[in-house]
Each structure stands twice: as structure tokens, then as C-alpha cells.
UniProtKB/Swiss-Prot annotation:
PANTHER family: CHLOROPLAST 50S RIBOSOMAL PROTEIN L22-RELATED, LARGE RIBOSOMAL SUBUNIT PROTEIN UL22M. One of its GO terms (cellular component) is cytosolic large ribosomal subunit. InterPro entries: Ribosomal_uL22 (IPR001063), Ribosomal_uL22_bac/chlpt-type (IPR005727), Ribosomal_uL22_bac/org-type (IPR047867), Ribosomal_uL22_sf (IPR036394). GO terms for biological process: translation. Keywords: Ribonucleoprotein, Ribosomal protein, RNA-binding, rRNA-binding. This protein binds specifically to 23S rRNA; its binding is stimulated by other ribosomal proteins, e.g. L4, L17, and L20. It is important during the early stages of 50S assembly. It makes multiple contacts with different domains of the 23S rRNA in the assembled 50S subunit and ribosome. One of its GO terms (molecular function) is rRNA binding. Part of the 50S ribosomal subunit. It holds the Pfam family Ribosomal_L22. Residues 159-182 are annotated as: Disordered. This is Large ribosomal subunit protein uL22. It comes from the Bacteria.
């Protein structure tokens, strides 16, 4: 008899974040966009369109998408490409064949507002937001960046080389001098 283990949402989220951090360490680039004022459900529809796509194709899809979240996601993809270029300065973006390796949308903070209702009541309006995390990577292996070796020189400091601090007058001497003058 096989038993299934139910994993909490918080544990799944922690695992997802750990996997994204691990991917970023290997050469992939991770970018965040926090507190986007769109509901999580609407943004996930747009994120599902570009998940696993090449970056050039994803940008084309997002550019002509009529949904509101597409503009924000397009800027995030462009920003992550710029981050990838900064991290891998020796490689060209066109030759790297970048793709969206991972993209997920988590719920952000919910602003609660009141809307007037009949008979003196008020309805609660929830203004939802979300957090987007995207990981882009290259399909091709990139050459390793050259490692610079820095030689360390041993510096011996002598006590005579250090200048000695001059002694400061005590604050009590100044106050005594002022009282004598008065």
C-alpha cells in the first residue's frame, strides 16, 4: 500500500525559491518584480504564455498581448536579459540562445478598501498584487570566464611607523579656565 505525503504550500514555496537560487548560481539569471498591482490570477495567464519560450519569441508574444500584465512582464524580461548580459559580459546575447527557464507568480500584499453600499453598509474591495520571479538561462554552453589571480604581498607593520595620537586636553581644564576669567 502506497502512501502519499501532502506537502505544505510554505514548504513548496521554499523549495521553489531554493531551486531558483541554485539556478542563478550556475549562470542563469534571476529577476524579481514585487508588488505589481494586478491580481495573481490574471498575471499567471500571461506568465503561462511565455514559460519555456525563447526570449525573442517571448518578447514578441508579450508585445502584442492585450492584457495589462504583459507590459510589466515584458519590462521584466528585458531587465533580466540586461542582467544576463552584465553577468556574462564575454558572451553575446544573440549567440547565447536565451530562454525562460522558470517563471512563477506569487501573491503579494492585498490592500483592503471600502466601497459604499446601500442602507449604510460598506463592502470590502480587495486590491490584489503579485510578485513575479523569472529565471532565464542559455541553451548553449558558454565559455568559462577567465579567473584573475591576485598576488598577495605580506605587509609587516612596525610600531615605530604608526604616528602616535596627540593627547587631548581634559574638558575639566577648560571649564576651570573659564571660571577664573569671570
Amino acid at each position: 500500500m502506497e502512501t502519499t505525503v501532502k506537502i505544505k504550500k510554505s514548504v513548496l514555496k521554499r523549495q521553489k525559491i531554493a531551486a531558483a537560487k541554485e539556478a542563478a548560481a550556475k549562470g542563469a539569471v534571476k529577476a524579481h518584480l514585487n508588488n505589481v498591482p494586478t491580481s495573481t490570477r490574471k498575471m499567471r495567464l500571461v506568465a503561462d504564455l511565455v514559460r519555456g519560450q525563447r526570449v525573442t519569441l517571448a518578447l514578441g508574444i508579450l508585445k502584442y498581448q492585450a492584457k495589462q500584465g504583459a507590459r510589466k512582464l515584458e519590462k521584466l524580461v528585458l531587465g533580466s536579459v540586461a542582467d544576463w548580459q552584465a553577468k556574462n559580459s564575454e558572451a553575446r546575447v544573440e549567440d547565447a540562445d536565451l530562454y525562460i527557464r522558470e517563471i512563477f507568480v506569487d501573491g503579494g500584499r492585498v490592500l483592503k478598501r471600502l466601497r459604499t453600499a446601500p442602507q449604510g453598509r460598506a463592502y470590502r474591495v480587495r486590491k490584489r498584487s503579485n510578485h513575479i520571479t523569472i529565471v532565464i538561462d542559455s541553451l548553449k554552453e558558454l565559455p568559462a570566464a577567465p579567473v584573475a589571480v591576485v598576488e598577495e604581498k605580506e605587509v609587516v607593520a612596525t610600531a615605530a611607523a604608526k604616528p602616535k595620537a596627540t593627547a587631548k586636553k581634559a574638558t575639566g581644564e577648560k571649564s576651570k579656565a573659564k571660571t577664573k576669567a569671570n
